[in-house]
């Protein structure tokens, strides 16, 4: 997936000086822009079948622009705390803030501290270590939304394992369904939608 290529692409450059990511399927036609990594010592090339990242990722200051996608930022937020020095990520026109909130929340749960200056700058201390190594992965609101909408149109469904306090933006499907007249029953981490 695009997320995997972007996040793992960044992560792998912290371990290896030369990384080649082979792409197939829909990834062949997608744009992948790793050019912001040049600020941290990594150059980027791509052709139809591969993304090539040359150079080992260094700590430092990096500028992320809107074209880079929030997924590159996610990769940097996950990777930079483990490098030897401190880093600063400067962002312009950040997209997909809920996904960044999810990343920051997960890292915080694991004991990784990152200072968020209103999504314009992230200050990352280097040499951090995980305080925990177990995570409970919450249900995916994006995937659940399709089924919840289908039930609102044609019947009923109950989906378990959805975190009602989730930072996932697609959790908003509940308010949309309510406005559309669907009957909702919410109990613990269980959501039932009934056609009304």
Describe the role of every protein-language-model region.
Residues 1-196:
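Short, structured segments at the rim of ligand-binding sites
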């Amino acid at each position: 997936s695009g997320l995997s290529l972007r996040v793992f692409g960044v992560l792998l450059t912290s371990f290896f000086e030369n990384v080649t990511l082979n792409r197939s399927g829909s990834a062949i036609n997608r744009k992948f822009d790793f050019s912001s990594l040049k600020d941290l010592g990594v150059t980027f090339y791509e052709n139809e079948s591969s993304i090539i990242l040359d150079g080992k990722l260094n700590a430092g200051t990096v500028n992320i622009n809107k074209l880079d996608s929030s997924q590159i930022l996610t990769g940097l937020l996950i990777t930079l705390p483990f490098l030897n020095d401190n880093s600063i990520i400067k962002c312009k026109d950040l997209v997909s803030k809920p996904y960044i909130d999810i990343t920051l929340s997960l890292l915080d749960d694991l004991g990784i501290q990152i200072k968020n200056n209103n999504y314009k700058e992230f200050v990352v201390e280097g040499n951090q270590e995980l305080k925990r190594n177990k995570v409970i992965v919450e249900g995916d609101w994006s995937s659940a939304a399709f089924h919840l909408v289908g039930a609102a149109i044609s019947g009923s469904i109950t989906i378990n394992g959805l975190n009602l306090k989730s930072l996932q933006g697609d959790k908003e499907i509940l308010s949309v369904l309510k406005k559309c007249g669907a009957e909702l029953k919410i109990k613990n981490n269980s959501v039932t939608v009934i056609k009304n």
